[in-house]
Swiss-Prot record:
GO terms for molecular function: RNA binding. Belongs to the influenza viruses PA-X family. The keyword Heme does not apply. It is found in: Host cytoplasm; Host nucleus. The record marks 28, 65, 202-203, 206 as: Important for efficient shutoff activity. This is Protein PA-X. One of its GO terms (biological process) is viral translational frameshifting. It comes from Influenza A virus (strain A/Ann Arbor/6/1960 H2N2). InterPro entries: PA/PA-X (IPR001009), PA/PA-X_sf (IPR038372).
Amino acid sequence: MEDFVRQCFNPMIVELAEKAMKEYGEDLKIETNKFAAICTHLEVCFMYSDFHFINEQGESIIVELDDPNALLKHRFEIIEGRDRTMAWTVVNSICNTTGAEKPKFLPDLYDYKENRFIEIGVTRREVHIYYLEKANKIKSEKTHIHIFSFTGEEMATKADYTLDEESRARIKTRLFTIRQEMASRGLWDSFISPKEAKKQLKKDLKSQGQCAGSPTKVSRRTSPALRILEPMWMDSNRTATLRASFLKCPKK
């Protein structure tokens, strides 16, 4: 699984995931499924904001070609991936500027068009189950929830999907591709099943020549969302950088 992640995700996303896991004492050699899940969630958050801007008239527009003369503002502020201190600083700044209610938990994005925070979810289970778990945790009607699955399903607060159909289809296609590539490598079953994950881990450790008695317990603790964001993500050219970074999984 680790090799798959390094092949299928942009190195910058992989690096952010590595730093986050290290910060919380998680070993990516052991928690390989969590490593893959964090990278996937990060990429979906970046893809969610990609191409979306607000023009001088305050209208939401989609721009795929950069025009240096255009006075555009990014529609979405990416909060996911920053360190906690910076993330809360950004959230507080947004709340002070827009009058938005401060969320209890750090959200993933802020939508300047709809003036609301957004929590993004990517699940290997039924979307409605994961949606309810998110809603019960957040306990706030002010934070918009949008859940994607690897099967192409999605669920959002009040069926308001925020993005246009084409943008959402791009995210769904990427998730479906990840699933298909995992399946072709025999990794999908272990990704969705803790029991199968343990079997795969033992197999991987054995193939790496590690002691058969090495600890194989997979943590059930949910990783905090990534809070480490490189300065480049703040740059005005981040959209072009991200667009170029979405790599297709190479075949075996």
